[in-house]
Amino acid sequence: MSSKWFNAIHLLVCPLTVLVGYLMNAYGYGAALQATLNKDGLVNAMLVKKGWFWTSLVGWWCIIRYRAVPGATGRDRRHIVQSFKRYAILTVWWYVFTQGIWFGVGPIMDLVFVYTGGHCHYDVFDDAGHVNEDFQGSVTRTNRALALIHNVLTLHGHHQEHRQQQLWDRSIGSIQGALQATQPKTPKNVTASAAAAINTFIHDQMHRWQGPLTTSAQCRRFGGHWAGGHDPSGHVFLATLMCMFLLGELRVFGRRALAHLYAQKWQLVRLVTRLFDTGPLWTWRRCGGGSMTCGARLWRAIVEPPVTCAAALLRLTRCIACDHPVIILLTLLVTWLWQLLLTAVASRFHTVREHMSGLLAAYIVTGLVYARDAAALRPV
């Protein structure tokens, strides 16, 4: 692939992915994808939220595998040093934008949110006296938040003044009713007239006993809902940053990695096809001849296939991980692009402006880093 085409892909793949998500929503194709989204799912918890770790692990293993090999030249070593500098800059930017600028100082995305009027809400009940559907966005998170709020209010209940005792009783009773109800979104003991007062009381008590909740992490930890200001999309930022890093470093070693993969393509084909040669029916058919007993046939058809399949899978995994980790890198890259598409489709979590601010925040640094090192990124 020519340098110009790779530059175009590197520059446009993330914005085009977001645009495709918007078009899917506009033409009604995004509803099915939105129904499958789960912010508390295993994929989101173990893969997406730890995305920079997985990206760092795979990216650096590829850099080491294809550059720090026996017989590496001085140019290879310079490429590794340059990759480390780029990675360090992107890691610092990821941390200060999403985790925190300094001890006790929130990340940039939270500072933007607070500066634009956002804060940690506790609008637990809506005007109809029901648990607010927009409070946490899912039943699981809502129940977890209600349990946290209930624990804090119960712990500090003896500190209430006499005139607040009635509100405390109402709040505790309403939350208990929501947690214990079969339909937690419609507790019977919350009235419309009391909902606003209860929300205000919960908000004041949580901020009083838990301190100023000025970061999204603190707000989530104590059962609040981050709302009211401009909240740059952390998912868009992270997915874009990871894609830009993987594509940028792939340009350095991609030609060597793909050439190595092409040279050993038939070995990979044999390892893959070996996985399909271990089924019971196939094994039974290979047990032809009259000299084999029925017990031996059953042993070979039932016991041997899973053992043989596991051994073949282990050999394939070892071959990919040790000899061709670029396959893992490309798989991870597709995964992050898919997550970016899902984030663009999930318009209920962020506005278009918030998506764009997350996208631009990632491009500010990655664009400068890879534009500055454009000469050093010539594929080798």
UniProtKB/Swiss-Prot annotation:
- InterPro entries (alphabetical): FIT (IPR019388), SCS3 (IPR046400)
What residues sit in the active site? Answer: 235, 350
> Which GO BP terms apply?
fatty-acyl-CoA catabolic process; lipid droplet formation; lipid droplet organization; lipid storage; phospholipid biosynthetic process; phospholipid homeostasis; phospholipid metabolic process
Q: Which top-level group of life is the source organism from?
A: Eukaryota
Please give the catalytic activity noted in the UniProt record.
Answer: an acyl-CoA + H2O = an acyl-4'-phosphopantetheine + adenosine 3',5'-bisphosphate + 2 H(+); (9Z)-octadecenoyl-CoA + H2O = S-(9Z-octadecenoyl)-4'-phosphopantetheine + adenosine 3',5'-bisphosphate + 2 H(+); (5Z,8Z,11Z,14Z)-eicosatetraenoyl-CoA + H2O = S-(5Z,8Z,11Z,14Z-eicosatetraenoyl)-4'-phosphopantetheine + adenosine 3',5'-bisphosphate + 2 H(+); hexadecanoyl-CoA + H2O = S-hexadecanoyl-4'-phosphopantetheine + adenosine 3',5'-bisphosphate + 2 H(+)
Which Gene Ontology CC terms are recorded?
endoplasmic reticulum; endoplasmic reticulum lumen; endoplasmic reticulum membrane
Mutation: residue 354 to A; reported impact is: Temperature sensitive. Inositol auxotroph at 37 degrees Celsius, but partially supports growth on inositol at 25 degrees Celsius. Impaired ER morphology and aberrant lipid droplet (LD) budding
Chief place where the protein resides? endoplasmic reticulum
User: Which positions, given as ranges, span the membrane?
Assistant: 8-28, 44-64, 89-109, 234-254, 326-346, 357-377
Its EC top class is hydrolase
Record's bilayer topology term: Multi-pass membrane protein
Per the record, ranges on the Cytoplasmic side are 1-7, 65-88, 255-325, 378-380
Q: What keywords are assigned to this protein?
A: Endoplasmic reticulum, Hydrolase, Lipid biosynthesis, Lipid metabolism, Membrane, Phospholipid biosynthesis, Phospholipid metabolism, Transmembrane, Transmembrane helix
Q: Any idea where this protein resides?
A: Endoplasmic reticulum membrane
GO MF, one annotated term: coenzyme A diphosphatase activity
Lumenal topological segments: 29-43, 110-233, 347-356
Q: What is the effect of changing residue 354 to Q/D?
A: No defect in inositol biosynthesis. Aberrant lipid droplet (LD) budding
What is the E.C. number? Answer: 3.6.1.-
**PANTHER family given for it?**
ACYL-COENZYME A DIPHOSPHATASE FITM2
Something else known: Present with 538 molecules/cell in log phase SD medium.
Q: State the protein's purpose.
A: Fatty acyl-coenzyme A (CoA) diphosphatase that hydrolyzes fatty acyl-CoA to yield acyl-4'-phosphopantetheine and adenosine 3',5'-bisphosphate. Preferentially hydrolyzes unsaturated long-chain acyl-CoA substrates in the endoplasmic reticulum (ER) lumen. This catalytic activity is required for maintaining ER structure and for lipid droplets (LDs) biogenesis, which are lipid storage organelles involved in maintaining lipid and energy homeostasis. May directly bind to diacylglycerol (DAGs) and triacylglycerol, which is also important for LD biogenesis.
Family of the protein in this entry = Belongs to the FIT family. Fungal FIT2B/SCS3 subfamily.
The protein, known as: Acyl-coenzyme A diphosphatase SCS3
Protein species of origin: Saccharomyces cerevisiae (strain ATCC 204508 / S288c)
